[in-house]
Every structure is written in C-alpha cells, then in structure tokens.
Amino acid sequence: MKTVFGLIFIISTYFCSAQTDSTRVNKIPDLIPQKMNGKVGYVNHKREYVIAPQFHLAMFFNSDCNLLNSQNVKAKKFGSPKYATVEENEIAYRIDKKGNKVYKYNKKDFAKCPSMIKTQKYKAYIMNGFFGLVNKDSINEGNYKDFVIYPQYQRLHVMEGDDINNPMIVAVQNNLFGVIDKTGKTIIPFIYSDIKLNYSWLLGKMFEVSVDGKEYFYVDENNMAY
C-alpha cells in the first residue's frame, strides 16, 4: 500500500467514523502519537512512551468504518476504536494498544463508509484582506452585527469537530498561529509558527502545532504539550 493512498484512505475513513462518536467531548485519548528521531510512537498522559517510536505514520486510536462495515468477519473486528492505523515501510496496519500489528490492510476487505459529513455552521469571511467569522451566506459588510467575529485576522480556519455550534478556530495574528473560539476568546496562545489544519481536533481533541515549522507535537485545549 503506497503512502499517498494510505494517507487519503486514512483521512477519509477516520473523518466518516469519528463523527458518529459523541461521547468524547474534550476528552483527550489515552494514547497520543508522538514523533522522535523521525519515527512515531504513542505516549500516555505522563508523556511516557507506551508504544516505542517505530512507524512512519500513526493515527489516533479510533474507529475505521471501512472495516466496521466489511463483509470479511475476520477483518470487521479490527474496525473497533480499540485499534489504531499506522504505516510502516509504506504498508498500513491496525495495531492494538500494546503496539502489536493485528491486521494488515487489504483493499478487498474495504466496505463503503456512509457519509456522515456535518455542514459547518460558521465559516471564515475575508474583507479588505482580513478574515472574520460569519454564520450566514449573505453579509452586509457595512453592518457590524452581520459578523460573529469582525475581520481582523490574517487567516481563519474553522476546525472540524463534534460540536458545530462551538467550533475551534485556527487563527493567524502577527504571523503567528493560535486557536480562538467563536467569541474571539484565545484558547491556544498565538505563539506557534504553524498549526496543522487536519482532523486532530475532531479525532483526538488536540491540535498539532510547531514552533519552528519543522517539528510538530500535540497540545490539548489548555496548551499542554504531549
């Protein structure tokens, strides 16, 4: 399985499956992917490695709807959130929480995932080169009340999440990245050179950040690093 295919497959799979779980509100995972010397393993909340760094790619422990709906009974059980998807030497596997490879991905086992995409309530709006936040399609730019957040940021991106009424929003201010809520309150301070616009908030209630644009790590909504 080639890396590019693996990335596309993993992202689409997790995106569909994670939105069906409404019980993990702001609870971070027990095991968190962390990279060391170019390889990824998993640490616990004490930042201790539980699964040694050995993978080229490692996702959060989460459901895989392609396997959950598989016609192959033996493969179906590995769609459980008890397992995580990893990639090593361009081959994708499911592993258990001890790091054991329990399943090697096979396209023949894949089933189609039902679409669970949620329409976002809020979206970024650009005016005069600055980004704000709106919750409707038709905006009167002269009416301040038409904006949820008046345009003032260099960039805004509404992160995918379980709660569309209270999204986390990646923002750029003074060329630094941070996270705000819909009221403009700072959740993650503007101290990072980059925050990845991926599904880490949806899947793990965490943000993948970097201070130098090269090395990335996860922080929770209290900006605690892992």
Segments (PLM) and residue ranges:
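Bacterial Sec-dependent N-terminal signal peptides
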Residues: M1-S22
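Residue-level detector of conserved, function-critical positions
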Residues: Q19-Y226
